[in-house]
Structures are given as C-alpha cells and as structure tokens.
C-alpha cells in the first residue's frame, strides 16, 4: 500500500500556526508538497521492488553467475551483457535505491537552479541534497550525495540569489541560485525549513512557527560584533589571545600568587577560573622577588599539550620573565630518557592495550617501583649483616648503612664507601676498620653499585613481576593482570632478542616515566644533556588531573628533597578513554600517593572565562560529578543552543551558513568546531572546506595558529584553551552516552567557549546535552 504523503492535510489547508504568515505558509507548503512527491516516488519504487517477478530475477541472476564461473571465454561477453541488463531492470523496479535512501530522512536541502544553456533558454531544475543519491526520472525526483556529487558544491558555496560558475565533471556550468533551503525531515515528517526569509519550525502537535532569527546566529561578545575590522580596538587576533590578565586577578588569586616558593600549592579550580593565570603570575612573582634563587632557567612549566606550550611561551615574556623552560611531560621524559639510556629502542608501540596503559599509569606503580628498590636495599643490608659477622670490627658498617636511609640506592652505597675512606660523616666512626676489612667492604660495595646502576634490568623486573603488580593494583582483575603481564613479558623478550616474528623492539609512552622514576630511586638525580644533575627551584604543573602519580613524583624530585611546586588541576576535567574505569580524580588520593597528605588544596571559585549560561550548561552536563560549589560566573551572554539534525550533511550546511554570516560581520572571530573523535572532526572539516567557509583549518596535533578563523578539531586537542565561540558537533547519544568519562569530555569541550556555545546533533541528541540545556535555561536571566 502506498504511504500517505507527509502532512498531506496541511498542503491544501491553512497551516496551523502560520495562518497570518502568508510568505511562511507559501514556503512551508512548497516543501510539504515536495516531500510528498519524494515519498510517493520512494513508495512506488519499493512496491516495484516487491513485485512478483523479483524472485525470478534473483534466481536468473544466480544462474548467470554460475554459468560465468564455468563458461568458455567466447561465451563470457554475452553472459555479462545478460547480467548487466537484468541488473538494470531490477534497479528500475527500485531495488538498489530504496534500500539505500532512508525514507524517514531522504534529503536535507532543496536547491533550485537556473542553468545557462548555450544558444538556448536558461533551464530550471530542482535538486535535493541528501546522504545518498537517488534519481527517479518519471517523477522528477533527484537526490544527490552531499559528499560526492559535484553539483552539491553549489549548495555549499553559494547563497540564494548568487550567480554561480563551477566546473562539474569536464564542463563549466554557469547559472543562478533561485532557491536555497535547508530542511529537517524526521520520521518522514517535515519539521523545519530554513530559508533567507526565515526559519520555520513544526512542534510535536503539528503547529508551525517562525523561529527567533537571532538563535541561529553566531555572534561575538560585546563591542566586537560591531568592529568590522582588525584594528577597531587596536588589537590583532594574536594580541587578543593574550589578554591583560594581570588586571583580572582577584584577592583569592593574589594570595596564592604571593605565597613563598617552597612547599606544595595545590590549586583546584573549575574551567576558566584562572588556574593557569595564577600559576604563571606566581612564576613571574618568584622571579621578581628573589631573582637569584628563582632565575628563569631554574624554574620549569609543564603543560598538557603543545598548544599550551606556545601560549605560555608568549605570556611569560609579557609578565617580565623570559627563558623559563616550558614543556609537556611526554616531551621532557622522552628527551631525558633517550639521553640517559642510549640503548633504549626509539620505536613507540602503537598497539599498547588500554589495560596496559592503565597499569603503567596506575597510582600503585609508585609502590611497585619502591618495593623493587627496597628489596634491592634489603639484599645489600643482608650482605652487610653477613659481612659484619665475618670481619672483626665491622659492626659499625651496618650502623653507618642505616644512617644513609632516605637517599637513592647508589647514593647510599657511594656514601658508605666514602665513610669507610674517612671522607663522609655518618655519625659513627670508621677508625675501627682494618685495611683488610675496608678492602673487602669496597669489593662488596663495588658489586652492589653495579646492580644499582642497572636501571634497564630493574625496569624489566618491575614490569614482569606479576605478584608485585597484582599486590599494588588490586582493582585490576585476574584477566586484566594476565594481559598486562603477557604484554610486558613479550616486550622484554623482543627487546632482549631483537626483531623476532616481525616484531620490532619497542617501548610504550608510559615507560619513560617509569624508567626515570627507577633511575631516581636507584641512582638519584636525573642528568641533563651536560651530564650534570637536573635541579629546579620551582615547578608549575598544569592539568595535574591527567598526570600519573609516577609522572608527578618524577617532576617533584627535580626540586630536591623538599619539593617546591605549584600544582593546578580540576577534578571535572579528567579525560579518560572509553573502557578506562579508573574513576574520578581525587586530590586527596593523589597527594597521599605522593606522600604529601598535609598539603592544602586551595579552591578557585570564580569562573572568568565563560558566561553564566555556559557555566550552568557545563555544570548540568557533569551531573553527579559536578563541583561541590557552584562556580561564580561574572557575566551573561547568549543562551546555549541545541540544533538537532538528521545527518552530518544537514549539520554542515547549517553550520557553513552560520559561519559565513559571522565572518562577514566579524572577520576577527575565533571559532572552534569540536568533535568527540578525530574522525568526526575530519568529516566536518571536509564539508566546511567544500562549502568554502573562510579561514577553516584542521587541527589534529595541537597546531593551533591563534589567528582568526575556524579551527576544526577534537576535544582532546583543546585542553586548557579558550575560543570566542565553540560549536560542539555530533553531540549525539552515540558519541556522548551517559557515562562519567563522556560527561567529563563534554564538560571540557563546552568550557572552551568564552562567549557563545552551540551543540549540534546529527542524530538522536545525547541526554547529557539535554540535561545541560535544561540547567542553562533554569538560570535566572538578568533584567534587560
């Protein structure tokens, strides 16, 4: 039975809600009629596909294929022609198109073109843009694929009323865009029509209304929307990336900045609360107040990504501090480990199982390393006990050894040797030792020092001692622990034996931190490229919620036995991959693992970056994982919007129009298009590039230019960054299911926006987004 046309009763009667809107009624009627035609064509194609002759066609096709497999070469052309003709007949009946085109959402745009015809009258034709191509000549329906059909470029590159000239295939086509509309078709029903005349929306009860046109506009903050040129406020886009943050410091932040440089300061703050601002000003303050102790080269800033390296390197000189090393932990650890271990494989594994990464970043890894080194120290103590029993007057050796506790193993051995030679005071006298006893002791210590220098073999032992790993990682079940152990054993064997069975010796990224920590426990201070001990007087470590305890312990030990560091982080911004069930970040747990239970946690409560609307949305997204205290926003802005679409192509079309309109009025705007995953970002980048959106850039490796334009990226690339406007794309239920890690990811993406935030769904919207929108709308609006 043929399907009833969508909203058929509305085509020939007054449109509910648009009774007094003549132009709106005309536009919506046209689109309802067009959808009815398309649905009728699809229904007819489906009916033909189900015709009684179809099984016979299928059987004959199978027979021809069987004949082809055994046919003589001379018979092949005729058989192939038969198969082609039969396939064409089946296609005409509808099979092959009905199964591809989604009848519930067959297209998302309507284009009417007037093409110039050489030596003839211009020809008008209507095109529909969808996710799949479909042509029905009899009914005049033509749907083209938005990604592949050359003619779809006209829709993305031109607006209604434009003259166009495009190379389509092997010919140049010229003409005019008479009509250009975007539509939303959900469940086979027309729900939205977007035109230059207005946006028309149909609710669940079938009532149409014109949408407030400002909802679908991206706009910059305050006077910026009125600037119109890059010099209206005397600042280029690059200058605006570096605001005069000194003028924004509040009393709470000032108290943190001016603390003494020794000890640990742990700063907890929501996104945009000024954690990084405080940290950088603290570095500048220390350099100013004690320039000898806190020389720039004796401090270091550690940030989570390359983009923040560029940002910090530009901010610090503006604060009067030049020459402070700025790095990521990965960059620092890789460079240092390669220098310390020349024989270490340079190949980084790209196949590391998630559970192995989790184990190597586990807080318990610190205890695993410590236990391994303590076992080695206990072995030395046992050998010294036996030595004292054998050699006369050697009892003082054990007492002297115990006095060295607290230092790295090799340092302890070296100090004991110096004590025996009379060059080190350990609180007991070595005068009772005979020359023979001293010689025997030195032989023992020389052998022990060889073991203490063996960092690589200790590393292998640490990672392959299943019992020790299981003891300190009780949250990993037996199956997970077996996988971790098997991976580490295999890596060790390949490194020992060289390339085997096509496997190349490799390390995991997380191994660098483990190696450096083992070095510190066994040999003491890390060595720089000049082979001198690395020592810093103060460290700033940003986004610590994403760092492992091993990484932080490595960094803190760079400042000596009494750590001096500013740690900045946010419990809500921990980024975990799907399947990583490490749970919520807790400052207390981290500080306990680091042996700093007494360190105070200083909260920052004011959100300076984002508007109250964005802050409320972000808090709603976090749900049960939100901060204990509501962040205090300092200003209001546009409402956070959710725009649902039925496909990525429809979303790209809408977004391209909005971005073009924005840059026509505000060329200095800096917009981030942020997807959950890199693959999604690539689809939107290609679509916007195809639509010729000005200044569109694909950012895949934190290579932000900090210039005006559109950065298309994924959420992991944006940690710690800020943009005027942010559009979160594919905020679908599939991309952001209700899980702790997805709540945090969505929170991070949303809080990159300083002024305006949009969410675009190309399928069923995520319930997390809907919760955030509800929270934002619950906000009490200021009086106008």
Protein language model regions, located:
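Conserved helicase motor core of SF1/SF2 NTP-dependent helicases
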Residues: 292, 297, 306-310, 314, ...
């Amino acid at each position: 039975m043929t399907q009833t046309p969508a909203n058929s009763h509305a085509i020939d009667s007054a449109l509910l809600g648009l009774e007094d809107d003549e132009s709106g009624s005309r536009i919506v009627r046209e689109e309802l009629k067009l959808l009815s035609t398309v649905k009728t064509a699809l229904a007819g194609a489906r009916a033909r596909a189900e015709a009684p002759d179809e099984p016979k066609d299928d059987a004959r096709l199978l027979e021809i294929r069987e004949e082809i497999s055994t046919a003589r070469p001379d018979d092949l052309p005729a058989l192939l022609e038969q198969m082609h003709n039969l396939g064409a007949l089946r296609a005409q009946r509808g099979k092959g198109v009905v199964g591809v085109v989604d009848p519930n959402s067959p297209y998302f745009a309507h284009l009417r073109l007037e093409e110039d015809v050489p030596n003839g009258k211009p020809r008008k034709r209507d095109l529909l843009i969808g996710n799949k191509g479909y042509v029905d000549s009899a009914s005049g329906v033509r749907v083209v694929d938005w990604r592949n059909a050359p003619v779809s470029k006209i829709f993305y590159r031109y607006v209604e009323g434009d003259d166009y000239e495009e190379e389509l295939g092997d010919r140049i086509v010229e003409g005019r865009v008479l009509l250009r509309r975007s539509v939303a078709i959900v469940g086979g029903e027309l729900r939205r029509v977007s035109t230059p005349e207005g946006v028309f929306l149909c609710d669940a009860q079938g009532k149409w209304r014109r949408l407030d046109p400002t909802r679908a506009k991206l706009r910059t903050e305050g006077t910026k929307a009125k600037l119109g040129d890059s010099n209206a406020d005397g600042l280029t886009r690059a200058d605006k990336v570096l605001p005069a943050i000194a003028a924004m410091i509040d009393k709470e932040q000032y108290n943190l900045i001016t603390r003494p440089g020794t000890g640990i300061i742990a700063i907890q703050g929501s996104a945009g609360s000024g954690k990084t601002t405080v940290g950088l000003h603290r570095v500048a303050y220390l350099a100013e107040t004690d320039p000898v102790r806190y020389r720039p080269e004796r401090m270091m800033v550690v940030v989570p990504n390359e983009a923040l390296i560029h940002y910090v390197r530009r901010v610090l000189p503006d604060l009067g501090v030049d020459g402070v090393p700025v790095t990521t932990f990965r960059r620092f650890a890789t460079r240092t480990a390669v220098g310390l271990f020349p024989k270490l494989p340079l190949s980084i594994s790209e196949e590391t199982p998630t559970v192995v990464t989790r184990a190597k970043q586990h807080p318990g890894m610190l205890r695993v390393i410590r236990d391994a080194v303590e076992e080695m120290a206990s072995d030395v103590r046992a050998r010294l006990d036996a030595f004292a029993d054998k050699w006369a007057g050697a009892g003082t050796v054990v007492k002297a050894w115990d006095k060295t506790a607290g230092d790295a193993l090799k340092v302890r051995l070296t100090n004991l040797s110096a004590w025996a030679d009379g060059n080190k005071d350990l609180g007991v006298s070595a005068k009772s030792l005979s020359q023979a006893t001293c010689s025997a002791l030195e032989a023992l210590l020389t052998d022990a020092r060889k073991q203490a220098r063996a960092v690589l073999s200790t590393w292998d032992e640490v990672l392959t001692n299943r019992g020790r790993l299981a003891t300190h990682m009780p949250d990993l079940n037996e199956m997970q622990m077996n996988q971790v152990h098997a991976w580490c054993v295999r890596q060790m064997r390949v490194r020992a034996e060289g390339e085997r069975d096509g496997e190349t010796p490799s390390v995991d990224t997380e191994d660098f931190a483990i190696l450096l920590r083992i070095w510190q426990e066994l040999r003491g201070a890390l060595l720089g490229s000049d082979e001198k001990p690395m020592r810093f007087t103060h460290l700033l470590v940003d986004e610590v919620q994403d760092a492992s305890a091993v990484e932080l312990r490595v960094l803190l030990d760079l400042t000596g036995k009494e750590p001096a560091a500013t740690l900045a982080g946010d419990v809500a911004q921990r980024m975990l991959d799907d399947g990583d069930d490490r749970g919520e970040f807790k400052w207390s747990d981290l500080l306990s693992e680091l042996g700093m239970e007494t360190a105070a946690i200083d909260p920052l409560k004011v959100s300076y970056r984002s508007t109250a609307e964005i802050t409320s949305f972000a808090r709603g997204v976090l749900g049960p994982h939100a901060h204990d205290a509501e962040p205090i926003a300092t200003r209001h802005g546009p409402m956070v919007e959710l725009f649902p679409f039925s496909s990525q192509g429809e979303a790209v079309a809408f977004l391209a129009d909005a971005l073009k309109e924005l840059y026509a009025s505000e060329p200095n705007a800096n917009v981030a298009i942020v997807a959950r995953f890199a693959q999604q970002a690539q689809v939107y980048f290609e679509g916007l590039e195809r639509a010729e959106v000005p200044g569109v850039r694909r950012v895949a490796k934190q290579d932000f230019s900090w210039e005006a334009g559109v950065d298309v990226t994924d959420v992991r690339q944006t940690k710690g960054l800020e943009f005027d406007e942010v559009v979160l794309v594919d905020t679908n239920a599939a991309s952001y299911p209700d899980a702790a890690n997805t709540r945090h990811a969505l929170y991070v993406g949303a809080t990159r926006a300083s002024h305006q935030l949009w969410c675009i769904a190309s399928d069923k919207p995520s319930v997390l987004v809907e919760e955030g929108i509800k929270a934002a709308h619950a906000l009490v609006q200021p009086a106008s």
